[in-house]
Every structure is written in C-alpha cells, then in structure tokens.
Amino acid sequence: MNYRPLGRTGLKVSALSFGASSLGGVFRPVDEAESIRTVHAALDLGINFIDVSPYYGATRAETVLGRALRGIRRERYYLATKVGQYGEGEFDFSAARVTRSVDESCARLGVDYLDLVQCHDIEFADLDQIVGETLPALARLRAAGRIGHLGITGLPLRIFPAVLDRVEAGCIATVLSFNHYELNDSSLADLLPYFGRLGVGVINSAPTGMGLLTERGVPAWHPAPPAVVAGCRRAVEFCRARGVDIVQLAIQFAVANPAIATTLVGTANPAHLERNVAYAEAPADPGLLEEVLEVLRPIRNHNFTRGRPENRDPILA
C-alpha cells in the first residue's frame, strides 16, 4: 500500500481508503458480522483511513464501525466522520447541533477523539452559516482536543473555493469531493493546483461514479443524465470485451494522481475489498486506459449537480 500526506495535517494516509457508508446498508442489506470482517480486512491490508457519517444508515454505519474497531489499537487508523446531515433532506449545521453530533459520533464509534470532522454536503447549506457558525464551533472542539482537523465535503466543485477563500489559512484541512475524479469526469483536476497552494488535503470518493462504471450498473435513484449512463455503459461493455473489469481501471485511474491523497471505496464484502486493494496496487494498462477515455470522450465531464441554486455547478450541455 502506498501512503501520501493528507495536505498539511501531518497524517500519511493510504492511497486507497475505506468508505464505511456500506456498513449502514446504504446500497444493499448487509450482514453485521461480514461488515466487521471487512473493516478488519481493510486494516490488515494496510488501509489506515476510514470515513463515515451519522447519515449513513441513520447512524447504523457508525454503530457497526464502532463495534468493528473495538479492541483495535487507536494508532492503527485515522477516523473521519461528518456533521450537518442526519437524514434524507435533514440538515442542521447550527453550532449546538454539530457540537452534539461530535459527542454522539464519538460514543457510537467508541473513541474519545476524531482525526477529522467534515461538514457534510455543504451545497445544501447556507455557506454564510458554514463560515460564520459551523466551522467556528468545530474549531472550538479542535482547540479542546476532541477533533484533530476540519474538512468540508460536497458534490459541486464551486463550493470549495467559495468557502476556502473566506476562512483563515489552516482552518480547513481537507476537502472531500465525489464523482469528479473518475474515468468519465476528471473536472476535480482543475482545482488540484489551488488546493495544493493552500496545503489542503484532497479526498476523492466514488471512483466508479456511484455505480456508473460497474457491471451491475446504476441504481434506480442515480441522478446522472441518460446520456451519461449510456456512455458509461458503452465503456463497461468495451472493457468486458477485452476481459477487464472496468472497476479495476477506474480504481487505478483514481489512485494514480499523486495530488489526490486518498480515494475512498465502499464495500461490506471482504473479498471485494481485497480485490479493490489488489487493483490499486497494480498500474493501469496505458493502452486500455487511452482507449476507454476515448470511448467516454463524448460525455467527458458531463455530470449532475445538486444543492441550493446558488451552490450548484453549471451543467455542460
């Protein structure tokens, strides 16, 4: 496993990290014992960064993860969770709620401090509140030793400079972006030099586009435009015809960029996790990668957006 610095946090994180949303049964019904085995397998394979949220499975993911981590030395892993989103359409970024949220997460996870706490999907928030209320409340917890570092997460890329440009240097240590550094959409790359100048660590999530780049395909709720779904399906079939699982290429593409500290993958299946780690540790076939990127060129960087109107990215026609 390769390890990279997470911005200026002083943390060296595995290039592939564990997204614990699957432990909450977000994508399919999961067995708790299997979920716990998956967490243990991740640590044994060298993954040292775990990301979760109280939103995933209505706190179930944090609860199961806490059980999995029971008895494991705290120095073996870095633990990140989130505040602000607690149910479908249920957001509360007030100082009182996020302060209480940190205490609740620590209790569920069985820890007395968190390495990273992130404001969850801030495109649904008033960014004035994030800057003026939420982050100062979390900074007080950081000063008290409950939190190591602060981060922000979301889908629209515009939200990151919209907040980072308004806070003191060092206030925000990380950004978590998803669906914007994958085979069909690498628009996050445009912001990487900016994050680098600020010393902000970049966490990439959803390298398969939340199912777009998989044999199984997208779930019914997936918001991608039909043209994007169809274009990704062509890439899946192209890889299949060449005897390659497109997930392999997607993971290899995501972890190859040294400006991205870590890429999150989520699964509650130990065998799938072992497969993903093996993919990440092997280089991509450059010829195949070039061919697949060409297949995807007509939909390149075409994606969906969401959030408050003022926080949304423009959509390519």
Each PLM stretch: what is its role?
Residues 106-125:
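Active-site groove signature of glycoside hydrolases
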Residues 6, 18, 35, 50, ...:
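Conserved, mostly hydrophobic/aromatic
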Residues 29-42, 93-109, 156-165:
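Short, acidic/polar
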Residues 11-16, 46-48, 73-77, 111-115, ...:
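Short, well-ordered coil/turn segments that N-cap beta-strands
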Residues 1-77:
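N-terminal binding-site loop/beta-alpha segment at the start of enzyme catalytic domains
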Residues 122-299, 303, 311-317:
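Beta/alpha (TIM)-barrel catalytic core signal, keyed to glycine-rich beta->alpha loops juxtaposed to Asp/Glu
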Residues 8, 44, 66-76, 106-111, ...:
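Acidic (Asp/Glu)-rich catalytic clusters
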Residues 21-33, 83-97, 125-126:
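Active-site mouth loops of central-metabolism enzymes
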